[in-house]
Amino acid sequence: MASLIGAGTAARLDRVIPEQELAERPLSELFRDYVESAPERRYEVWFFNVTPPEMELALPTTDAKLNYLAHTANLASAVRYDCAGDTDGGRCVHARLLERRRERFAKILNKFLDLHQILGTIQQ
């Protein structure tokens, strides 16, 4: 529990909460037991790098990544609906690759946005 941390020190929650609890318990319970139960405790904020290396190399800034996501969504839409009424399995390999990359990148951005929302709730 939060009592594992001495007063005045800051630790990462992933090092305080046992791995089994992280896997089994819902976020709301973990928040209640480790954060709300001891509001005077301070925890470090950390980020895991979940960006694929090729994406990080080509698009080093958040703005570049967001622009890439918007561009690939537009391109995928154009490729999909450019065919004469064929909107399903008749797409070429390039269109399928673009779709997979766009989905992968969207998942990464959603993780960042989820983290931002969680941190915003903790600060309130």
UniProtKB/Swiss-Prot annotation:
GO CC entries: host cell nucleus
Main location: host cell
Matches recorded under InterPro entries: Herpes_TT2
Domain of life of the organism encoding this protein: Viruses
GO terms (BP aspect): viral DNA genome packaging
Cellular localization per UniProt: Host nucleus
Keyword list, A-Z: Host nucleus, Viral genome packaging, Viral release from host cell
Keyword Translocase in record: no
Assembly and oligomerization: Associates with TRM1 and TRM3 to form the tripartite terminase complex.
Family to which this protein belongs: Belongs to the herpesviridae TRM2 protein family.
Protein name: Tripartite terminase subunit 2
Organism: Psittacid herpesvirus 1 (isolate Amazon parrot/-/97-0001/1997) (PsHV-1)
Annotated gene: TRM2
